[in-house]
């Protein structure tokens, strides 16, 4: 793995092993990132198997061209530089209308967090950017400096679940009236200034939730995940599986709800037989989310909030 794209893969074996890999199968890594999951999955495929890898970050694909070279040379890998919300259309265009499994590792990859100029981190001074796709137009700068007060409050509450959303939005509104807010440090200091002193003594950085909220807005992360996971569930073959790693409650809630809707049946009480078209199409492989082991948590602090949910298609 190239030094500039160092990424420790979370829940590596659990995520891939629970896909119950068929050596000749067709699989998708919807979030290539540091290519850790892809490399492990490819090690389980025969030369007849194939993996399609999505990422909207060209650096992730460039890195994978090196780390997965032996599989690329055998024609087992296809890279697709795009947001995974376009997964179904892009696969269909390649003649793929059914897959045996897919995995998602949602959120920001370590290299994106560590690359100062990307503007994802409140711990490093950088321009307000936060774009996962460097070619997209909306940046954190636009959100912070142009969104109306009420829109900021809504985003901070909805995506950051921060109870001081109004106070923070007001502080931002006051500051940008004097001059634009240009850097992550400026924004982090404004967030700290908007919170009461006792709040600042609590564990964790006071800007964490607001930075998360802005990042989700800039990249439409939840909208993209919702669309993509639903499309992936449609594409799955019978007995195909989907693994989703989430890192915060909003992603986990979304995944849990989508899996629940597909794996439960809502029929009137007393109905003697469940109509065929009302039967569940999925079953949960694990009733509760799978969490990182103690040893993984010790080795990788970024794994602390990770949760893995897995579902299996039982009816087309």
From Swiss-Prot:
Domain of life: Bacteria
UniProt keyword annotations, A-Z: Cytoplasm, Methyltransferase, rRNA processing, S-adenosyl-L-methionine, Transferase
Transmembrane intervals: none
InterPro entries membership: RsmH, SAM-dep_MeTrfase_MraW_recog, SAM-dependent_MTases_sf
Binding positions (S-adenosyl-L-methionine): 35-37, 55, 84, 105, 112
EC annotation from Swiss-Prot or TrEMBL: 2.1.1.199
A GO biological process held by the record: rRNA base methylation
Subcellular location: Cytoplasm
Claim: Translocase is one of the keywords in the record: no
Keyword rRNA processing attached: yes
Known catalytic reactions: cytidine(1402) in 16S rRNA + S-adenosyl-L-methionine = N(4)-methylcytidine(1402) in 16S rRNA + S-adenosyl-L-homocysteine + H(+)
Coiled-coil portions: none
NCBIfam families with a match to the protein in the record: 16S rRNA (cytosine(1402)-N(4))-methyltransferase RsmH
Function of the protein: Specifically methylates the N4 position of cytidine in position 1402 (C1402) of 16S rRNA.
Similarity annotation: Belongs to the methyltransferase superfamily. RsmH family.
Protein name listed in UniProt: Ribosomal RNA small subunit methyltransferase H
Organism of origin: Streptococcus pyogenes serotype M4 (strain MGAS10750)
């Amino acid at each position: 793995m190239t030094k500039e794209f160092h990424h420790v893969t979370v829940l590596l074996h659990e995520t891939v092993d629970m896909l119950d890999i068929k050596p000749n199968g067709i699989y998708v890594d919807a979030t290539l990132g540091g290519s850790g999951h892809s490399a492990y999955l490819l090690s389980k495929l025969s030369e007849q198997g194939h993996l399609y890898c999505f990422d909207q970050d060209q650096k992730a694909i460039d890195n994978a061209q090196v780390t997965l070279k032996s599989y690329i040379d055998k024609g087992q890998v296809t890279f697709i530089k795009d947001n995974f919300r376009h997964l179904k259309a892009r696969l269909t265009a390649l003649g793929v209308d059914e897959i045996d499994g897919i995995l998602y590792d949602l959120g920001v990859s370590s290299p994106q967090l560590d690359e100062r100029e990307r503007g994802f981190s409140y711990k490093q001074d950088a321009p307000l950017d936060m774009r996962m796709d460097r070619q997209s137009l909306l940046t954190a700068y636009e959100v912070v400096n142009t969104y109306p007060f009420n829109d900021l409050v809504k985003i901070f509450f909805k995506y950051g679940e921060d109870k001081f959303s109004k106070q923070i939005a007001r502080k931002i509104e006051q500051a940008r009236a004097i001059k634009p807010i240009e850097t992550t440090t400026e924004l982090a200091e404004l967030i700290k200034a908007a919170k009461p002193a006792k709040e600042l003594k609590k564990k964790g950085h006071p800007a964490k939730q607001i930075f998360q909220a802005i990042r989700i807005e800039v990249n439409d992360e939840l909208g993209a995940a919702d669309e993509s996971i639903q499309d992936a569930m449609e594409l799955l073959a019978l007995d195909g599986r989907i693994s989703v790693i989430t890192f915060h409650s909003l992603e986990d809630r979304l995944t849990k709800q989508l899996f629940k809707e597909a794996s439960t049946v809502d029929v009137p009480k007393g109905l003697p037989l469940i109509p065929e078209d009302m039967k569940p199409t999925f079953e949960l492989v694990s009733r509760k989310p799978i969490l990182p082991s103690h040893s993984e948590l010790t080795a990788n602090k970024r794994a602390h909030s990770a949760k893995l949910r897995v579902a299996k298609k039982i009816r087309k």
